[in-house]
Amino acid sequence: MTDKIVTSEEMRHYDSYTINTIGIPSLVLMERAALAVRDEILHAFPIALKDVVVVAGSGNNGGDGIAIARLLHLAGVHVTILNIGNPKHASAEHQTQEKIAQYYQIPETSDLAVLNKATLIVDAMFGIGIDRAVKGAYADAINAINNTDVVVVAVDMPSGINTDTGEVMGTAVRATTTVTFAYNKVGLTKNAGKDYAGNIVVANDMGTYAVD
């Protein structure tokens, strides 16, 4: 396991090199990310799996979340996808994951009330890309998550935490555990990010290659 800690720019560079130069498709990386989060949830929180809610944004972090929901569903977990944001803005990878989830008839909703019955929440709204204050439906979702008292597993970064500074961008998810991909992130080690991340699990077997 590496102790390397990276910025958002470095992580984007590594992802881009892996996808565009080496040729590993982004969907492969997304599946590996989802497997890592699924494994952490199943192994670390087996008593919290009665009603899992995956809160998915419209970008690739949300695509990770939808893949996580599918993998939990296939493991026999009752899971609901809570969609946040505009589906018209969904990334291509997100759209692919959504199509697969529909095949498996995984329940989906946009009603925040579903969080009231959750026994575990997966935060998959924002990954490493946030650079402005969280507002609107995303802020409402974050505040609703924080008003629960259940286990929260953040995907890559707690939504609302700046990847480079660890600062809260208006509002941010308070996670029980953050599963971050390939390398630890600077924002998880400083300022509010240290507290909001909870326990940090670095999923370093991602197939992402660092070339500086």
Curated annotation (Swiss-Prot):
PROSITE patterns: YJEF_N
Keyword terms: Isomerase, Metal-binding, NAD, NADP, Nucleotide-binding, Potassium
Record's cofactor remark: Binds 1 potassium ion per subunit.
Keyword Transcription part of the UniProt annotation: no
Catalytic reaction annotation: (6R)-NADHX = (6S)-NADHX; (6R)-NADPHX = (6S)-NADPHX
Sample GO molecular function, one term: NAD(P)HX epimerase activity
Binding positions (K(+)): 61, 123, 159
InterPro entries recorded: YjeF_N_dom (IPR004443), YjeF_N_dom_sf (IPR036652), YJEFN_prot_NAXE-like (IPR032976)
Binding positions ((6S)-NADPHX): 60-64, 127-133, 138, 156
Pfam family of the protein (one): YjeF_N
EC number: 5.1.99.6
Family: Belongs to the NnrE/AIBP family.
UniProt name for this protein: NAD(P)H-hydrate epimerase
Origin species: Limosilactobacillus reuteri (strain ATCC 55730 / SD2112) (Lactobacillus reuteri)
Gene: nnrE
